[in-house]
């Protein structure tokens, strides 16, 4: 028997295997043939395939004719002095919050430009979220692994996303620094890989904490282990984002340079009580309007505030947004 017979037998076995799978909802050989035959290799398909082979789908999907249709003229503008770019990161919430403060400082001191370090705030955001996870694991160590809260914790050990409560909680505790004091890095602009690696390490730590608690570790021992684990997370953050400054020298244009800590800098130039002077407004049609809602354990700091918002109709939010823009307060 030649190789041809061997290949035929293998093909028959493959088809038989596919047929067996079909009995359990799989793709049979007959079904696979129908699927293959349904594809018609048209000249247009060939052109699309060649284009997709070397070009991003997002680039190809852009309608070039629409690029000139955007009207960039506005009746009112906020004194932002340029844009800020979150790059390929999930820090939209942080950029938005810092832009509110940025416009206030530009207007207050008549600055030509100003930008706060998003990287500085993000560093402590990730460290605080790591602690939030680990402490959550300690708090639920007496519950089974299939408990809904435990399951949720291990599914969401760390993220780069957030909302304004996180901005206020991080700044309240750690202050602010100018962007020049802690610049962006590749990982701060591309947060996905860094956050996923730290998340994997946190899951490992979470299992270790649960095991320690199950074998009788006292609260003080668990606290010690958690602190050591956060030391590892801190090192990972330093390697990817850089180490946050504790002091720096800065001055307003034409002013005398002074040394600041991040907290003293924030208090001197802004000093706004973000925790008590601001409230999140949201439009959630699935819940009753004109009420305040709080999402449990959805926060950035263990000792911080939960995601809390006032639910308003979209018409009310539009009016407030317009008034804010006109007042240049964002």
Task: Show where each model-derived region lies.
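Solvent-exposed, well-ordered amphipathic alpha-helical segments
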Residues: 8, 21-22
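Structured alpha-helical subdomains that flank or immediately precede key functional sites
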Residues: 22-88, 94-330
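N-terminal signal peptide c-region/cleavage motif recognized by signal peptidases
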Residues: 15-17
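Short, small-residue-biased leader/transition segments that mark boundaries at the very start
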Residues: 1-7
